[in-house]
Amino acid sequence: MQSTVQWLENVAFEAKSESGHTVVMDGSPAYGGENRGARPMELILMGLGGCASFDIVTILKKSRQDITDVICQLQAERAESIPAVFTKIHLHFVVKGHGIKEKQVAKAVELSAEKYCSASKMLTDGGVEITHDFELIELSV
């Protein structure tokens, strides 16, 4: 996997992925940014949510659950000192659909956290405490 990050101006950068997608990153105005894009640490948090959500959707589809939406809400805490690394992250999954079995969702969340999510594994190996929970929303037919 490869990526290129190019400086645009001030503290703004454009990242290009190997698959051809671009993302603009920018610092906060307090550091000379203009709020033109997500902060780099926000992208790490979003990447974790995307990685875990990918697992949840894939696992639930394989277990034939009739899901219509999966939302991952993340809350993170960072160290007070430099480097201001993540210390705690909580992932809350909101799973919507028809006749979804709670046991299947619990299993999907557990498998993502303990086996499949590369981003989660990398962060927990680095000392980040990651917790998970979920809620089911049954949609009427």
Regions found by a protein language model. Give the residues of each.
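Extended beta-strand/beta-hairpin segments
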Residues: 1-46, 57-141
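Short glycine/serine/threonine-rich phosphate/pyrophosphate-binding segments
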Residues: 54
